[in-house]
Curated annotation (Swiss-Prot):
GO cellular component, one term: photoreceptor inner segment
One Pfam family, short name: G-gamma
Gene Ontology molecular-function annotations: G-protein beta-subunit binding; GTPase activity
Lipidation (S-farnesyl cysteine): 71
Residues recorded as bearing Cysteine methyl ester in the entry: 71
Phylogenetic lineage: Eukaryota, Metazoa, Chordata, Craniata, Vertebrata
Protein name: Guanine nucleotide-binding protein G(T) subunit gamma-T1
């Protein structure tokens, strides 16, 4: 898809592009923000038991755990 420089377009072309965009947007299904927030909250709460950021990572499976001991170079 080619890039369009808006400054190079006539006023008529700009308005036509705006109308085309609005035609696309009018067909989108919209939901109330309060309903979306409820669904997102419920989704997060349902999966919080599996979330390693909430639950934590078991020490034996933590790939970032500092290794004990060291390396001796001789």
């Amino acid at each position: 898809m080619p890039v369009i420089n808006i400054e190079d377009l006539t006023e008529k072309d700009k308005l036509k592009m705006e109308v085309d965009q609005l035609k696309k947007e009018v067909t989108l299904e919209r939901m109330m923000v309060s309903k979306c927030c409820e669904e997102v909250r419920d989704y997060i709460e349902e999966r919080s038991g599996e979330d390693p950021l909430v639950k934590g990572i078991p020490e034996d499976k933590n790939p970032f755990k500092e290794l004990k001991g060291g390396c001796v170079i001789s």
